[in-house]
Amino acid sequence: MGAYKYMQELWRKKQSDVMRFLLRVRCWQYRQLSGLHRAPRPTRPDKARRLGYKAKQGYVIYRIRVRRGGRKRPVPKGATYGKPVHHGVNQIKFARSLQSTAEERAGRHCGALRVLNSYWVGEDSTYKFFEVILIDPFHKAVRRDPDAQWITKAVHKHREMRGLTSAGKKSRGLGKGHKFHLTIGGSRRAAWRRRNTLQLHRYR
């Protein structure tokens, strides 16, 4: 096995003594830092490389801290107005994952960069920590790379805001196989519309 495979196996056993100690120390370290900061290198180089990271110019890693738990509806003094069925304020669950929230924050902070992907690096009772891979679309090392130049096109601006990253697609229910029948045709809405539209084809 190569070195990256050994690292992957270490990360798969998160309950081992080594990883439990390491994750506790790292979570303490991350809590002392700001909620969004640039990491000098990926904490999990094996995972980052599987997601498209390359250790060369134009690639950046940002570490994001996201508060765990549900999402309270942002209304003044709990006044939602309308019918009682929609009065919920406290026990509201956000439609997207905390990982996609981390990607969004990184994309907002680094507006000129493109979000490629992200991965989990730790969590405690209050926070989850993710590392986000960002790419500079104007760097020559990226523009001249046939494997990475797709992200330089304008259509990929702020893909994290539109649910086009891996974490975003997961929240949209997109995927292959029998578990993803609700989104055949591109989205939940497209699948619902097709199944609920009566088509009487004309006999010719």
UniProtKB/Swiss-Prot annotation:
Subcellular localization is given as: Cytoplasm
Gene Ontology MF annotations: RNA binding; structural constituent of ribosome
Which InterPro entries does the UniProt entry name for this protein?
Rbsml_eL15_core_dom_sf, Ribosomal_eL15, Ribosomal_eL15_CS, Ribosomal_uL23/eL15/eS24_sf
Please name the PROSITE patterns in this protein's record: RIBOSOMAL_L15E
UniProt cross-references to Pfam families, sorted A to Z: Ribosomal_L15e (PF00827)
Chief localization:
cytoplasm
Single Gene Ontology BP annotation: cytoplasmic translation
GO cellular component, as recorded: cytosolic large ribosomal subunit
Name the cystine pairs. Answer: none
Q: Keywords assigned by UniProt?
A: Cytoplasm, Ribonucleoprotein, Ribosomal protein
Q: What family does the database annotate?
A: Belongs to the eukaryotic ribosomal protein eL15 family.
PANTHER family xrefs:
LARGE RIBOSOMAL SUBUNIT PROTEIN EL15 (PTHR11847:SF4), RIBOSOMAL PROTEIN L15 (PTHR11847)
Q: How does it assemble?
A: Component of the large ribosomal subunit.
Q: What does this protein do?
A: Component of the large ribosomal subunit. The ribosome is a large ribonucleoprotein complex responsible for the synthesis of proteins in the cell.
Q: What's the protein name?
A: Large ribosomal subunit protein eL15
**Which species does this protein come from?**
Anguilla japonica (Japanese eel)
